[in-house]
Amino acid sequence: MTDICTICHNTPNRPVRLDCNHEFCYICIKGSIQNDMLNCAVCRRPFDSSIILNLSAQVCLKGDAPRDVDDDEEEVQDEEIDVKPDVNLLRAAMNANQNGNRELVAAAPHMNNNGNFHNAQGNYQVPTTSQGMVNQFGWPQFQAHSDFPYTLGYWGNQFPPFWNNAARNWGDVQQAANPVFAGNNQFLGNTQYNVFPPGQMGLPLPTTNIKMDIRDDEQNSVGGQQGMQTPTAGSDVPTAAQYNVQANFNVARVKFFWLYSSRGDGWWRFDQRCEKDIEDEFLANKPNMEMYLFGKPYILDFVAMRQWQKGNLDAWRQIKRVTSSEFDMHNVKGIAGCHVPNVWTVD
């Protein structure tokens, strides 16, 4: 018996043990059989193709694939990397402690030697009253001149990905190529910025105002704004733009499954490793993709949501991309042809 499948060189997924005691992934052995390769890939001992007939495995239908060998090697390599401390990070932490801020301080690559934040080009400096402090999102915050009583969140010319382009419509300040701060005539340069009402040192994530199921997978790919409250002047309710940003952030955490129709009733889930490749191509907006399934080339059409073996378009099957709750509404018999019995069934 080996620790890896010598066909795909990964940890065996739904392992099949041959008479010679060597183990392989179910999908790898099935592909070997469909290509008339009936010898063990390790010792070359012949095996009977009936070994996979009506094969079942006690695995979770929604489970992930075993951790790949390459993942373990990358983790070990990462541990061996010697990372030197960031001087700016240490300086920011010291300044934060002096101001009584005990929160975790993020790296501040746009802080100069005097502790002032500036833009990515370093052409402009902005006076601050909270040097080295960060908000709950881990990016610097500062209070501008007293004649400009708005709190600005600033990180060079960038923002955390799920807050970019948000919160620009509160207050009387709008985005400009070179905004002038009222009262101190200081330019921030060609940068993006967020504007918050007085007293708001960064907005909370708007999770409490979004109607959600107890599970994240109830958040669909275009929604996320159910139960939204209408913002009013001076209200703490985030704007529609912020809801859109938060909705997209929630969608990024949703897990999707890929199914293909059985020849009879029901559905099969794709092998988890194949599923990951399919999802990556789908998210890349590819109209179709070609991949090997069971050792044979298949075409997956994301427009018609069909798959077929290359060269045999007439024998197509339907495919689906579903959330966890949608998965439960389908009769999923197993994974890639391997039955997963219901161990709780009582006759």
Curated annotation (Swiss-Prot):
<keyword id="KW-0862">Zinc</keyword>
<dbReference type="GO" id="GO:0005737">
    <property type="term" value="C:cytoplasm"/>
</dbReference>
<dbReference type="GO" id="GO:0004842">
    <property type="term" value="F:ubiquitin-protein transferase activity"/>
</dbReference>
<protein>
    <recommendedName>
        <fullName>Uncharacterized RING finger protein C02B8.6</fullName>
    </recommendedName>
</protein>
<keyword id="KW-0863">Zinc-finger</keyword>
<dbReference type="GO" id="GO:0061630">
    <property type="term" value="F:ubiquitin protein ligase activity"/>
</dbReference>
<dbReference type="InterPro" id="IPR033509">
    <property type="entry name" value="RNF146"/>
</dbReference>
<dbReference type="GO" id="GO:0005634">
    <property type="term" value="C:nucleus"/>
</dbReference>
<dbReference type="InterPro" id="IPR013083">
    <property type="entry name" value="Znf_RING/FYVE/PHD"/>
</dbReference>
<dbReference type="Pfam" id="PF02825">
    <property type="entry name" value="WWE"/>
</dbReference>
<dbReference type="InterPro" id="IPR018123">
    <property type="entry name" value="WWE-dom_subgr"/>
</dbReference>
<dbReference type="GO" id="GO:0006511">
    <property type="term" value="P:ubiquitin-dependent protein catabolic process"/>
</dbReference>
<dbReference type="Pfam" id="PF00097">
    <property type="entry name" value="zf-C3HC4"/>
</dbReference>
<feature type="domain" description="WWE">
    <location>
        <begin position="244"/>
        <end position="321"/>
    </location>
</feature>
<dbReference type="InterPro" id="IPR037197">
    <property type="entry name" value="WWE_dom_sf"/>
</dbReference>
<dbReference type="GO" id="GO:0008270">
    <property type="term" value="F:zinc ion binding"/>
</dbReference>
<feature type="zinc finger region" description="RING-type">
    <location>
        <begin position="5"/>
        <end position="44"/>
    </location>
</feature>
<dbReference type="GO" id="GO:0072572">
    <property type="term" value="F:poly-ADP-D-ribose binding"/>
</dbReference>
<dbReference type="GO" id="GO:0016055">
    <property type="term" value="P:Wnt signaling pathway"/>
</dbReference>
<dbReference type="InterPro" id="IPR018957">
    <property type="entry name" value="Znf_C3HC4_RING-type"/>
</dbReference>
<keyword id="KW-0479">Metal-binding</keyword>
<dbReference type="InterPro" id="IPR001841">
    <property type="entry name" value="Znf_RING"/>
</dbReference>
<dbReference type="InterPro" id="IPR004170">
    <property type="entry name" value="WWE_dom"/>
</dbReference>
<dbReference type="InterPro" id="IPR017907">
    <property type="entry name" value="Znf_RING_CS"/>
</dbReference>
